[in-house]
């Protein structure tokens, strides 16, 4: 029996942060500044991102509706992912102009997908949206020892399958329940314009990207939700290796997300030969 299950989520997350501080505190100087060179009052300060830059998108009516729909799925108490969902909706809108379907690996309550189908006239696009998840959290078979030491398995999820079925009952969405990579073959689309990967650990995420890569159309968008987060360095390293091997580039955003826009031909990378 895992004794951690007896402790509340808030305490488990606090312990993860304490472990991080204990590992890194020597690099924090006494006179360190938390905020440097902000250009006015903070316009956004949540989800690991603080900025004084323009955040007018949060007041746009279409985005506000999409975000409200996402938040209504209630992924967790205090859900505040406006900028991440702004990125999700932007990528989805650009991808909607391309041939192919939408695929999301790692769904939880469906917040990201729900924001997309609200933001776009999704049912009029002639596309399908495939949602793949266990709908009850990470499969412990696929969590490595290195990931466990980072606290990846401390996150707890409720069984959200019935909620997700209800949430998307009016949309052209196919819900595939089970662990990735076991369920990948059930996603029968031939082309993909938008692929979201958010399963919080390396094995299923790389398996999904390898499986779907050839189906992603040229110019298609691949959104990596955990790419830049400090607890998920192993995923970032794995995605970097994947992209480098295929001559692709990953845009790292201050939201923690990473974006690949699939290049038709491999991008040029300077080598030590000087060529």
Feature locations, PLM:
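S-adenosylmethionine/decaboxylated-SAM
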Residues: 47-82, 89, 96-275
């Amino acid at each position: 029996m895992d004794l951690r299950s007896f402790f509340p989520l808030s305490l488990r997350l606090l312990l993860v942060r304490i472990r991080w501080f204990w590992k890194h505190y020597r690099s924090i100087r006494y006179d360190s500044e938390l905020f440097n060179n902000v250009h006015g009052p903070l316009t956004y300060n949540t989800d690991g991102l603080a900025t004084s830059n323009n955040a007018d998108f949060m007041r746009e009516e279409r985005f506000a509706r999409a975000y409200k729909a996402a938040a209504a799925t209630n992924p967790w108490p205090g859900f505040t992912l406006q900028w991440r969902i702004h990125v999700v909706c932007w990528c989805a809108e650009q991808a909607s102009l391309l041939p192919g379907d939408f695929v999301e690996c790692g769904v939880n309550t469906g917040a990201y997908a729900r924001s997309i189908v609200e933001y776009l006239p999704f049912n009029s696009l002639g596309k399908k949206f495939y949602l793949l998840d266990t709908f009850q959290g990470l499969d412990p078979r696929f969590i490595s020892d290195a990931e466990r030491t980072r606290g990846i398995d401390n996150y707890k999820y409720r069984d959200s399958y019935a909620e997700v079925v209800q949430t998307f009952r009016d949309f052209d969405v196919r819900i595939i329940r089970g662990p990735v990579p076991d369920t990948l073959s059930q996603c029968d689309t031939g082309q993909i314009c938008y692929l979201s990967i958010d399963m919080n650990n390396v094995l299923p995420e790389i398996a999904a990207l390898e499986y779907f890569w050839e189906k992603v159309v040229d110019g298609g968008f691949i959104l990596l939700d955990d790419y830049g987060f400090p607890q998920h360095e192993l995923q970032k390293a794995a995605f970097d290796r994947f992209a480098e091997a295929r001559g692709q580039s990953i845009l790292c955003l201050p939201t923690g997300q990473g974006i690949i826009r699939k290049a038709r031909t491999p991008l040029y990378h300077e080598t030590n030969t000087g060529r």
